[in-house]
Amino acid sequence: TLIHTFDWSPALSSLSLAALLIGPLAFGLREARRQAPAAAPSQHGKTAALLDGTPISAGAALKEAFGHRDYLLLTAGYFVCGFQLAFIGVHLPSYLRDHQLDPQVATTALALIGLFNVFGTYAAGTLGQRIRKTWILSFIYAMRGIAMIAFVFTPTTPLSVGLFAATMGALWLSTVPPTNAVVAQMLGVKHLSMLGGIVFFSHQIGSFMGVWLAGRLYDATGSYQVVWWIAIVLAFAAALINLPIREQLQPARRLVSA
């Protein structure tokens, strides 16, 4: 809407000013200083630290994570998440333009994605307290694949775009709560920032590939059809990848409190 009304430069300036507010607001986010509690017992009745009582180092945690099959599967699945979100977020307006839809349809679609993302993320976090988080992740990825198939095979109209955007919005960042929770359950919270950051790094590599590959294939074929099918295949692959992931905390390997 800002671009349509004021052109791209004022719209970008408005977003930049909004981003500048993040810095001052962040100063209010302070953790209360408190004494670290004793190590809590793991599921196997031992303390979540090394057997000699020494907390595991960042290097040792990193080495263990990369030797952990379930952690690697989770990381691979998150690559797919980034691929899909970046492809749709960046290239959906161009795809709709190719179908002769008004630019406002694209902006409305992106707004709907943002709106329904709120509800989807909250729902995923709430459900994660009741059922297995890896099942939630598999469901999210599978539903993305189904939604994209329906979108590709139905006529592209403002209504179909709105329904697709709302559906994808509900599935957008709903992967975040269960993914971070699985990392914490598998490897503890002592080095969660680092280990969760590596999983998110995979997400960002997927984002790059989604944007770059879609542009390259569009230039080569004049269509986004190939990229849609790549995203669909990846969706079901990610759904399958997350099914065998085990969420158990590794025995006697983590200090639960930083």
Language model segments and positions:
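Interfacial helix-cap and linker-helix signal at transmembrane-aqueous boundaries
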Residues: 1-6, 96-97, 127-128, 213-222
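Helix-loop-helix hairpin linking two adjacent transmembrane segments in secondary transporters
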Residues: 1-35
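MFS 12-TM fold signature
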Residues: 18-22, 143-148, 168, 234-238
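Multi-pass alpha-helical transporter architecture, strongest
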Residues: 22-31, 230-258
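Flexible cytoplasmic inter-helical loops of multi-pass small-molecule transporters
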Residues: 30-60, 251-257
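Extracytoplasmic gate region of multi-pass secondary transporters
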Residues: 63-126
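C-terminal transmembrane helical hairpin of 12-TM major facilitator-type secondary transporters
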Residues: 87, 105, 111-117, 121-182
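A late C-terminal transmembrane helix in Major Facilitator Superfamily
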Residues: 173, 186-221, 231
